[in-house]
Amino acid sequence: MSQTRAEATPASDLTPVVAVLGATAAAVAIWVVATLAGAELTVSFGPGQPIQKITVVNVVVAALVGSLAGWGLLALLRRFTTNARAVWTVVATIFALLSLGGPLSTISSAGTKAWLVAMHLAVATVTIVGLRRTRGR
């Protein structure tokens, strides 16, 4: 009987790019499903404040900003700490949970809040899982 060992394949240099684009694609996919399902993705940030429609551009920009910020923080931590991945994962998870305050604090329907929370969680999950796989300490 022969024994085979699975070798861990190193992450590609493209892994962070794939993570950022994947997080963005996940948010856009949820936005598309919500829109096709007839969800009215509009929010207001307080009484008397204007109602804002959540567009695909809003979704793309928010996902890119969040995931690129995560990538930047991970790169900085790798430069200055020896346990960057662990520290970054904790910080990223805290920021992901705090980001839920945005959609949950808006004046919008429960359905809109649910769709927005789903987008936030999708971006956070893909970003955290994807960037943890990148090379580095």
Residue ranges and their predicted role:
Residues 1-13:
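Short, Lys/Arg-rich, polar N-terminal cytosolic tail immediately upstream
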Residues 10-35:
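N-terminal signal-anchor transmembrane alpha helix
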Residues 15-19, 122-137:
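Membrane-water interface at the C-terminal end of transmembrane alpha helices
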Residues 16, 75-96:
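Internal alpha-helical transmembrane segments of multi-pass membrane proteins
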Residues 22-30, 61, 65, 69, ...:
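Lipid-exposed faces of alpha-helical membrane segments in multi-pass integral membrane proteins
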Residues 30-38, 74, 78, 131-135:
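Membrane-water interface at transmembrane helix exits
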Residues 42-55:
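Perimembrane loop-to-helix junctions flanking transmembrane segments
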Residues 101-115:
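Membrane-helix boundary connector in multi-pass membrane proteins
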